[in-house]
């Protein structure tokens, strides 16, 4: 299309009937594309792109058909002993977030937790994933109280639910994780329905005390791995996320799913590396698992 338009501008001396032909061709191409449901745009960026807006990290892509993914990043840094504790009075540790760099492909953030912990985030958008590389440092002379933290991806639009609906669980049938080595749609079996705060669902891995997770209903089953996700409204795409190390998998009340990452309480002077992924890929689960297992070899699948 650009070639045709350049052709028109560079040949102003041609007879009028010759100039009209390319324009007719261009119009025909655009009309045919519209009839087929194809969106024709100029210079459309390839892959995913990022925007930092207040406390949200926004993921955009032409593949999302206008449904951007908004991630509350980070929602909270959290203390241990959180499963049956007051979320505000006990669990959440205040923090501030400073944007160091904000471009469409790379965002750098520095978080300062009120107990002195400093966490530097390097977030990079790729063709069909967002990569997270975190460095947590405790420059103080006391152990940090931050044992885990949560990024909250809001996925209602991606899942295709009615934005006017007041049913905050309407997206749950689109959500999944892995139990007994197989994909399990939510609500899974033995869905827990009692907790300090309702509704929601938490899955705790074997390496984390069951007293140190989100104060929502705690499922009795242990997840097979650290991957959790949501199918798109038409089931053609999957949003999935994982972190290493991870604290829990969580289906929440903001039409969200979390793979919350683990800090473990850094000792004085200690530094830790944390990494994470968001995948926005075709709904080919075997291929997704292969990719996840390559990215997170530490996450051995349990059956």
What does each model-found stretch correspond to?
Residues 1-20:
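N-terminal secretory signal peptides that target proteins for export/translocation
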Residues 125-180:
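Acidic (Asp/Glu-rich), glycine- and aromatic
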Residues 43-96, 103-104:
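Acidic-aromatic substrate-binding/catalytic surfaces of carbohydrate-active enzymes
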Residues 108-110, 120, 131-135, 273-277:
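Beta-strand secondary-structure signal
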């Amino acid at each position: 299309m650009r070639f045709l338009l350049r052709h028109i501008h560079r040949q102003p001396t041609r007879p009028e009937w010759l100039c009209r032909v390319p324009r007719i061709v261009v119009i025909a191409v655009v009309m045919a594309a519209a009839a087929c449901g194809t969106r024709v745009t100029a210079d459309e960026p390839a892959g995913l792109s990022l925007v930092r807006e207040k406390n949200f990290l926004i993921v955009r892509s032409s593949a999302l058909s206008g449904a951007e993914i908004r991630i509350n990043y980070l929602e909270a840094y959290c203390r241990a002993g959180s499963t049956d504790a007051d979320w505000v009075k006990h669990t959440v540790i205040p923090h501030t977030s400073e944007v160091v760099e904000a471009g469409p492909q790379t965002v750098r953030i520095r978080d300062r937790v009120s107990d002195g912990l400093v966490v530097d985030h390097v977030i990079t958008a790729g063709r069909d994933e967002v990569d997270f590389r975190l460095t947590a440092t405790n420059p103080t002379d006391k152990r940090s109280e931050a044992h885990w933290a949560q990024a909250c991806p809001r996925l209602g639009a991606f899942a295709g639910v009615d934005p006017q609906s007041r049913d905050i669980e309407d997206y749950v049938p689109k959500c999944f994780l892995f139990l007994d080595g197989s994909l399990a749609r939510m609500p899974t079996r033995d869905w827990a329905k009692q907790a300090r705060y309702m509704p929601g669902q938490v899955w705790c891995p074997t390496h984390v005390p069951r007293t140190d997770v989100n104060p929502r209903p705690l499922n009795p089953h242990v997840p097979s791995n650290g991957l959790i996700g949501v199918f798109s409204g038409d089931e053609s795409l999957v949003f999935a996320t994982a972190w290493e190390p991870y604290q829990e998998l969580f289906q929440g009340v903001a039409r969200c799913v979390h793979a919350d990452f683990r800090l473990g309480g850094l000792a004085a002077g200690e530094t830790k590396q944390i990494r994470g992924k968001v995948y926005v890929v075709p709904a080919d689960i075997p291929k997704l698992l292969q990719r996840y297992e390559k990215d997170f070899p530490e996450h051995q699948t349990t059956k």
